[in-house]
Each structure stands twice: as structure tokens, then as C-alpha cells.
Amino acid sequence: MQETFSDPLPIDACPIRLSSWMGGDRDGNPNVTHEVTSAVLLDSRKRAAKLFLEDIEVLVKELSMADCTDEFREYINDFEVQEPYRELMKRLRSQLKKTIIYLDGKIEKRLPESSDDILIHNDQLWEPLYACYKSLVECNMSIIANDRLLDTLRRIKCFGLT
């Protein structure tokens, strides 16, 4: 888009928002019950969490640099860690794994593990990654910020976790 229109797309722009009506055909189809709709929604959330987990796994490996803004150190609340971006990605990885386990429990109709520290809203994934992005840009690492991390931020806006 940037090559065509010359201006970069704002980072939080969402020119396309994808969604699905799977499990929502409840206008007379007797096979689409509340349970079917609920199961489809849970399965979709789990799939989204798995896809974002794949992104975070790559970012854990890629974001090993130490230079970051003071604001980012405050955000992660750790002034001693040597690889602050990696530390944040590890936290997100843990939250995504807990989210997947929780959703598995809901799908299998058993009491899920604790719902503590799971990702429910898109902003729970967007905000930490955007803080990471801003810090990288401010520390003259725009090339890194505008690669996989920017792709992930755009996917959050386009697809989300829910």
C-alpha cells in the first residue's frame, strides 16, 4: 500500500476487518444450536491464540537487543533485565499458552485451568506489542520494528483474538 499511495498506513489502521458467521446460521437451521455457536466461537478464539503464539515465538528469537526507552522499562516493570523485548515476549508467550489451555478446557466441557493471566481482549495483546514497537522506533530500530512486529500488530487489528 505504501508503494502505491506513498504515505505509510497508520500503525493502528484496519482497512479490512475479517470476521466469520460460522456457527451463526441460527435463523431456522435446527442443527445450529447455542452449543454449536459457543463451540465454534471457542474454537476460533483458540485458533487465533495459536496463530499469535506462533508470531510471539518468532519475536522471542528476533528481539534480543538490550537498548530500549526508559518508558518501556517502566512498562515491563523490570530495570535489570538484559533483553527487555525478549522478556516481554516471554510473558506474552506464557499468557497465550495459558489462554489456549483455558480454551481447551472450555471446549472439552471440563473445568478449565484458572482464568488468571489469560488474554481475553485484543488490547491485552496490542498494548504490550505497541509499547515494544514504540520503544524500538525511538531507539532507532525502525527496520526491526517494521518487520514481524508490525505484521503482528496489523493482524491484531484485522483479526483479533476474539
Regions found by a protein language model. Give the residues of each.
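Non-catalytic, well-ordered alpha-helical scaffold segments
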Residues: 16, 46, 50, 146-153
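Extended active-site and interfacial segments that coordinate phosphate-rich ligands
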Residues: 32-58
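Conserved phosphate/anionic-ligand binding catalytic regions in large, soluble enzymes, centered on
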Residues: 16-36, 152-162
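Generic signal for short, ordered secondary-structure residues
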Residues: 7, 31, 35-38, 115, ...
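Extended, charge-enriched "interface" segments that sit outside catalytic cores
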Residues: 63-162
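Short, hydrophobic/amphipathic alpha-helical packing segments
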Residues: 2, 53-56, 133
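Extended, Lys/Arg-enriched charged tracts that mediate electrostatic binding to polyanionic substrates
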Residues: 1-18
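Conserved NTP-handling cores and scaffolds of large molecular machines
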Residues: 5, 56, 60-63, 67
